[in-house]
Every structure is written in structure tokens, then in C-alpha cells.
């Protein structure tokens, strides 16, 4: 599983009785036919997994639910992929994804945009059933800092994610160049990257932050910067929204389903570094706007994107599958 998918499934494990995550090292994906041999299903009555290698777990006796946490086969992703990834996505991974669809009992996706993208790119009929269940966040764990001071003296911007081209890390130095002097971008390095960005006074690394420490990291920040080019349904955005942060993001994929432009943050043309800097500067100059947008985002999380809501929908789905 990818990092976000792994976290989402781990969250389900903490909330649903008899739901167990069986992890495997990413290196085993080079020998996917070995996966059933190195993992133990322990008498499972239902399999819930991502589509990448689901075909190898598709036994007729056990119903399988697959969830698209993202869709890397998307052609729009190719400019942001390595040569190896381009070949992998266009050949074996696409074949395995189609096999997974055939073997699955039910297909879900974490956003409307992901569901539509899967249908379009794989040539599926528009009526092909893909149930959308939005990712959720623990709104009791990720909370705003009730003692935060909103002022114009400094503004702390957070980039949360791996330093990959898909996440838009390569735009950070250029965005930083256009920011006002009182603004600093703090960036995480994720779990899979040791890259360090250029040494700029307003660009600072916070290293790899453990998941359990992320609520405190968001509380220390004023704005979330999300220049990613493709997201199934970003957990980082949900976490930041729950902590009362406005979000400045690319206007693409599922991000408009999370962020309401002008109310919870700003959506910029993809890769427009000047637009990103302009919106960040605007938020830095207006503590009141940051507070209003942060409160709007927190309310939206409580209404639509809580962990409890996500769990309830998956529980209903699993019960339906097992009953039928």
C-alpha cells in the first residue's frame, strides 16, 4: 500500500472489530505472485485492499472489496513520473488493475473525481458501480489550537508530504522566492525521501514527522501549502482542515471536493508559483481571513469528513457484502 492508503486502512483497524491490516514490504511488489504466500489471511471472511495487487488475493470463496485511494495510471500523471513508473503503469499495473476489477465483489473510491477518472481511463461503462466513501479524520485528535495568536508579524506555512514531483515539491523554492519576508515554508520529508531543498532563508526542513506528532505540527502552523498534482483524497488536507488551517492548493483532481475556494482557502492553476505566493501573502497579511477560513474548514470536517462517518459507511458496506 502507499503511505496514505496504509494510514487509512490502519484507521479502520482501530475502529472496526475483527478488521486486521496485513502489511508487506514494498519490495515484494516486484514479485507480486508471491504475496499470497508471505501474507496470512487468518481465516478472513472478507478481503479489503487496494487494486494494485488485489488480483493475487481474489479467491472465489472470499468476497473482495477494493478501494481506489488514488489512481496512478492517470495519463496526466505521466509528466510527473519516472521512466520506470511510466512503463510499469502502462503495462503490468494496468493489467493487474483490470484483473482486480473482475475479481472484486465491490469497488469503492475515496472521491468522486477518482471514481470518474478510473471509469474514463480504463474504458469502463459510465454505469459501472464505484461507490464513493470519503476518507475521514479523527476530529478529536486533530483539533485547532485554542490559544493560537493570529498576527501579521510572522506566518508559518507547512508543506506536508514526500518530496516527490507528484506532490509538487519542485515548486517550493520558486514559491518561496515570491513570498514576503515574514513568511517561512516548513516542509516535511516524508518516510520515503532524504532529499533536501535548496538552502533558502524562508525554506526549512522539519524532517520526517511521526503520524502521532502531526496534530501538534499543524497547530504550530498558519497555512497548509498543497501543490500536489494528483490526490485521491488527501489525508494531509483533512488533517490541516481539522486543525483549523486554511489551505492553498492546486485546482485539480479531488482537491476542490475538499477545499472550497474563497471559503476554506484558495485553489490555484496547476504549477502557477506566482498565484500560490500571491494567495499565501494575502493570508499572511490577513489574520482575520486565516481565522475565518480555518473555522470554515473545521466545520466542514465535522459535517462531512470525520473518521466516525467513514467507519460507519465501511461497516455498512462490509455487512452488505457478507450478507449477500
Show where each model-derived region lies.
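Carbohydrate-associated surface elements
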Residues: 113, 136
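Conserved acidic donor-binding segment of nucleotide-sugar-dependent glycosyltransferases
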Residues: 261-262, 266-273, 282-287
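Membrane-proximal helix-turn-helix segments that form the acceptor-binding/catalytic region
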Residues: 87-107
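Short hydrophobic beta-strand element within catalytic cores of glycosyltransferases
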Residues: 246-249
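Aromatic "clamp/platform" in nucleotide-sugar-dependent glycosyltransferases that forms part
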Residues: 229
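Conserved donor-binding/catalytic core segment of Leloir-type glycosyltransferases
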Residues: 149-167, 173-180, 186
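Short alpha-helical donor nucleotide-sugar binding micro-motif in glycosyltransferases
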Residues: 208, 216-221
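A short, well-ordered alpha-helix in the C-terminal region of glycosyltransferases
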Residues: 275, 282, 289-304, 310-316
Amino acid at each position: 500500500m502507499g503511505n496514505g492508503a496504509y494510514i487509512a486502512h490502519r484507521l479502520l483497524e482501530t475502529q472496526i472489530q475483527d478488521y486486521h491490516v496485513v502489511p508487506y514490504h514494498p519490495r515484494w511488489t516486484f514479485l507480486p505472485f508471491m504475496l499470497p504466500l508471505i501474507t496470512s489471511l487468518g481465516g478472513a471472511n472478507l478481503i479489503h485492499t487496494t487494486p494494485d495487487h488485489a488480483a493475487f488475493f481474489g479467491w472465489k470463496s472470499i468476497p473482495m472489496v477494493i478501494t481506489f485511494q488514488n489512481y496512478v495510471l492517470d495519463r496526466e500523471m505521466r509528466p510527473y513520473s519516472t521512466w520506470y513508473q511510466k512503463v510499469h503503469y502502462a503495462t503490468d499495473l494496468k493489467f493487474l488493475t483490470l484483473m482486480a476489477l473482475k475479481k472484486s465483489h465491490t469497488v469503492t473510491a475515496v472521491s468522486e473525481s477518482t471514481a470518474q477518472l478510473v471509469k474514463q481511463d480504463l474504458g469502463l461503462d459510465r454505469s459501472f458501480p464505484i461507490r464513493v466513501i470519503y476518507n475521514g479524520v479523527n476530529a478529536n485528535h486533530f483539533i485547532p489550537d485554542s490559544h493560537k495568536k493570529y498576527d501579521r508579524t510572522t506566518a508559518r506555512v507547512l508543506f506536508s508530504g514526500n518530496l516527490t514531483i507528484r506532490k509538487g515539491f519542485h515548486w517550493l523554492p520558486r514559491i518561496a522566492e515570491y513570498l514576503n519576508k515574514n513568511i517561512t515554508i516548513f516542509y516535511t520529508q516524508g518516510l520515503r525521501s532524504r532529499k533536501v531543498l535548496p538552502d533558502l532563508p524562508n525554506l526549512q526542513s522539519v524532517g520526517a514527522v511521526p503520524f502521532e506528532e502531526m496534530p501538534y505540527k499543524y497547530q504550530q502552523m498558519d497555512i497548509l501549502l498543497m501543490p500536489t498534482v494528483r490526490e485521491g483524497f488527501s489525508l494531509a488536507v483533512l488533517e490541516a482542515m481539522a486543525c483549523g488551517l486554511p489551505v492553498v492548493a492546486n485546482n485539480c483532481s479531488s482537491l476542490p471536493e475538499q477545499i472550497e475556494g474563497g471559503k476554506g482557502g484558495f485553489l490555484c492553476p496547476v504549477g502557477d508559483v506566482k498565484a500560490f505566493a500571491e494567495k499565501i501573502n494575502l493570508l499572511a497579511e490577513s489574520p482575520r481571513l486565516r481565522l475565518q477560513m480555518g473555522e470554515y474548514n473545521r466545520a466542514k470536517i465535522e459535517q462531512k469528513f470525520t473518521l466516525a462517518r467513514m467507519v460507519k459507511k465501511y461497516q455498512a458496506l462490509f455487512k452488505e457484502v457478507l450478507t449477500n
